[in-house]
Amino acid sequence: MKVLVIGGGGREHAICVTLAKSPKVDKIWCAPGNGGIAQVAECVDIKATDIDGVVAFAKGNKPDLVMVAPDDPLALGMVDALEAAGIRAFGPRKNAAVIEGSKSFAKDLMHKYGIPTAGYAVFEDSVSAIAYIKEQGAPIVVKADGLALGKGVTVAMTEEDAIAAVKDAIDGGAFGGAGARVVIEEYLTGPEVSVLAFVDGKHLKTMPSAQDHKRAYDHDEGPNTGGMGAFSPSRFYTEDIAAQCMETIFKPTVAAMAAEGRPFKGVLYFGLMLTPKGPKVIEYNARFGDPETQAVLSRLDSDLYDIFNAVIDEKLEEIDIKWKDDAACCVVMASGGYPKAYEKGKVITGLDDVTDSFVFHAGTSLKDGQIVTSGGRVLGVTATAPTLDEAIQKAYADVHKIHFDKAHFRTDIGIKKG
């Protein structure tokens, strides 16, 4: 079988590597791919958001399945366009991907269906938003409504920081159209947990829990990023909490989307906060998280191609998905300066010296036979082991073997206590 994967980051590398393990899959294309993905798939020079280009390629090359991984093409309706052309596609349609594409839609959905989340208000003008901030006080959370590469959230510890975030988003255009509307939320406390689930429109099967590290620097300091590392499972996500989330959050969300005429098919990511008052939803993503996917898929013990087909055919209930007991840790190596300005084209050395981890490539490309940096998040060094502590040690031992100019990584992935 032939599969086309859309995207070019560490998440897509993990998806391609996992699909390549399937005895049913004998050909993988990835558009646009990257320097690491090129080792397991044929990279195609088509942008992930080029719907017409992807559809034309699929019509010409006839993949048995197209897997749309990133948020932007999902929000633009790539799955709808592929299905309209008679091509099997994995991922939510445009009207379901809105659960990530608009935070105000997601908040209103949760409010309507009684799904636990933080209190909130939505604003399109800064004057009203600032008045609300002054009324509520700090700490408070300001979120751009639309897609902002994971960087549209400000956890403001002072009113001044919150007001600055509102002005940047609405008046300053910091996130373009994505920030023209903002959601202002109550500040929640507790451990954060990511739970991804396969969803076929009616049923869902959750993956093992994970925990992301969004801040750029150690001790959760610095600006938000797309994610500096992840580990699985979460230390805090017990069987009791999992059962509670299934009844109060996971099933109600899938049912709510179906009731709204927006059945969700694909991977639904639940960003949760385990508060003193119980689990609450911080955010939804309409796709595999990055870098959680690198950690979680390293633990998969079933055929990913079969799972994708079960989702598309709405037969998720008929398959059994197995996971390894091992823990996993993914440490992201980023370009110096990320998530702000950074340089590209730095030669990466030491990849052949890695012994105990798998290195997922994110912002890399091939240049004159060498792997060079081409993005903010460059590599995801991922190790599995019987215990989380062992996985962390293995991952960091290999991180220290890899070098590129101004490389930056957090030293506390997996050590986080809350």
What is the predicted function of each stretch?
Residues 1-94:
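ATP-binding N-terminal substructure of ATP-dependent carboxylate-amine bond-forming enzymes
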Residues 4-5, 100-181, 211, 235, ...:
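Active-site nucleotide/adenylate-binding loops and adjacent lid/helix of ATP-dependent enzymes
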Residues 20-21, 36-38, 60, 90, ...:
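Solvent-exposed alpha-helices and their adjacent loops that cap or buttress functional pockets
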Residues 38-41, 55, 98-104, 217-218:
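Short, charged, surface-exposed secondary-structure boundary motifs
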Residues 156-293:
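Internal nucleotide-binding/catalytic subdomain
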Residues 246-268, 285-354:
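Active-site "cap" helix and flanking loop/linker of ATP-utilizing ligase/carboxylase catalytic domains
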Residues 310-418:
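Peripheral (often C-terminal) accessory segments that flank ATP-dependent C-N-forming ligase machineries
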